[in-house]
């Protein structure tokens, strides 16, 4: 009899542990900058549903993408590696076979979760192939019907037999790319009013003295990506109007998912994470789209709603990399095995503590490759007080900004003698990171 009981006793803690693990709902937009939310005081748009998540959760104000381009950023999220480690530094490059079977969906599934994916995958195919990377595809890359597919999933999982991991990945506000190219928008309709009704220009609209000159060079070499060279001030204001309407459009879709979470009483045992793969220039420094290392492009929204809405409404300043750190955090919450060689730092403990002074990590790095132009490489090192940027070519390729006094990055301190030691410290941090991550 004892030999029959042993396997049952061994399974009991696992079953209990699985029941206690939270569901995970990951809501992701494409190309949304951190300031494109009304809950942080932006009066140029209204995002009531994202605001609902912020009121219920913890907002990380210093969350950064691992790469300011969709394919590399998403590959990093779902593998736990930086894009250069994968060789996925351009859109259209597939995740290598060496890690395809150890991606996040597979690992979380092996930990006992049901994994479902709805919407844009883009790592590298537009939609996730059904059954690959550990996910069941419940809706292809199309914002129309995406929220409804997620609502149907949640309605059928109000009392799940096992925990679930649901990804809702929207395309918008990415349609701003088509807007800039004067093309039809795939997933939204926008009528731009008279310019007098459009948002004003950002405070950091002008190209700053001592800005890296390679940025404008890259812009000139990729007109299809950056068709804004001849934009007037009014054109930029229209661009900003369209961008904020696209954010509001996707906010309405997110609201359907939030309503379903309410309806099915899922808050008590669910972690809901809202974020984006990267931001958009939104006219700052005369920039649209991504790839560059301005904060409008690299600083992304990140809201974490904990089970029972613990620490609701708190804002935390800890530095987050929404590539490897997201991967590590999901492994932490689900009990999935985190592969050796992935270096992400889980933000679970910081979110659950709600302590703005809790130790997390001293800096985060974002890496970029301008994939259609001069092929410029760049890295940014964000510390609690400063941001250091290095491009591999051009004049003024080093940038240093005081992120308390100059969040708009208008005064490059790298050219000022008084900040020579701070500059050296950040150079050493980047050198340390490059050695650790094998960047030559």
Model-derived features with residue positions:
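Active-site-proximal cap/lid insertion segments
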Residues: 34-35, 40, 156-162, 170-269, ...
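Active-site-proximal N-terminal segment of extracellular/periplasmic enzymes that hydrolyze or transfer
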Residues: 19-58, 67, 179, 408-419
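Short, solvent-exposed turn/loop segments enriched in Gly/Ser/Thr/Pro and often Arg
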Residues: 39-41, 57-81, 94-95, 117-127, ...
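C-terminal cap/loop subdomain of S1 sulfatases and analogous C-terminal strand-loop tails that border
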Residues: 146, 157, 163, 278-284, ...
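Long, internal low-complexity/basic segments
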Residues: 19-22, 29, 33-34, 59, ...
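Short, structured active-site-proximal loop/turn typified by the sulfatase FGly-forming signature C/S-X-P-X-R
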Residues: 41-74, 80-85, 110-115, 194-195, ...
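Catalytic-site neighborhoods of secreted/periplasmic enzymes
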Residues: 76-166, 170-190, 360, 393
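A short aromatic-rich beta-strand->coil structural motif
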Residues: 24-32, 108, 120, 165-168, ...
């Amino acid at each position: 009899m004892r030999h029959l009981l042993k396997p049952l006793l061994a399974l009991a803690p696992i079953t209990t542990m699985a029941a206690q693990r939270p569901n995970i709902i990951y809501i992701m937009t494409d190309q949304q900058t951190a300031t494109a939310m009304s809950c942080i005081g932006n009066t140029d748009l209204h995002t009531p549903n994202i605001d609902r998540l912020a009121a219920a959760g913890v907002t990380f104000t210093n969350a950064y993408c691992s790469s300011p381009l969709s394919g590399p950023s998403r590959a990093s999220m779902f593998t736990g590696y930086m894009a250069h480690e994968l060789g996925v530094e351009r859109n259209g490059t597939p995740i290598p076979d060496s890690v395809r079977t150890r991606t996040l969906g597979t690992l979380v599934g092996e930990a006992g979760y049901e994994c479902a994916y709805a919407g844009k995958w883009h790592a590298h195919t537009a939609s996730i192939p059904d059954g690959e990377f550990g996910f069941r595809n419940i809706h292809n890359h199309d914002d129309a019907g995406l929220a409804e597919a997620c609502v149907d999933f949640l309605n059928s999982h109000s009392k799940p037999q096992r925990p679930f991991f649901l990804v809702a990945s929207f395309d918008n506000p990415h349609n701003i790319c088509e807007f800039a190219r004067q093309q039809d928008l795939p997933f939204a309709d926008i009528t731009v009013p008279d310019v007098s009704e459009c948002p004003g220009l950002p405070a950091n609209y002008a190209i700053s003295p001592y800005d890296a000159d390679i940025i404008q060079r890259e812009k000139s070499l990729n007109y299809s990506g950056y068709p804004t060279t001849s934009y007037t001030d009014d054109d930029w204001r229209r661009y900003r109007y369209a961008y904020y309407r696209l954010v509001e459009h996707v906010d309405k879709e997110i609201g359907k998912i939030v309503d379903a979470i309410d309806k099915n009483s899922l808050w008590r045992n669910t972690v809901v994470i809202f974020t984006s793969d990267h931001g958009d220039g939104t006219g700052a420094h005369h920039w649209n789209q991504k790839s560059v290392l301005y904060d409008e492009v690299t600083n992304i929204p990140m809201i974490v709603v904990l089970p029972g809405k613990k620490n609701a409404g708190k804002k935390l300043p800890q530095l987050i990399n929404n590539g490897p750190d997201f991967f590590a955090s999901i492994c932490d919450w689900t009990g999935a095995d985190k592969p050796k060689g992935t270096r992400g730092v889980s933000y679970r403990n910081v979110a659950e503590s709600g302590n703005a002074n809790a130790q997390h990590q001293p800096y985060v790095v974002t890496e970029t490759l301008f994939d259609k132009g001069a092929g410029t490489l760049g890295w940014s090192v964000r510390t609690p007080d400063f941001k250091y940027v290095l491009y591999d070519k051009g004049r003024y390729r080093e940038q240093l900004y005081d992120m308390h006094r100059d969040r708009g990055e208008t005064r490059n301190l790298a050219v000022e003698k008084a900040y020579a030691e701070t500059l050296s410290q950040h150079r050493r941090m980047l050198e340390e990171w490059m050695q650790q991550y094998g960047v030559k």
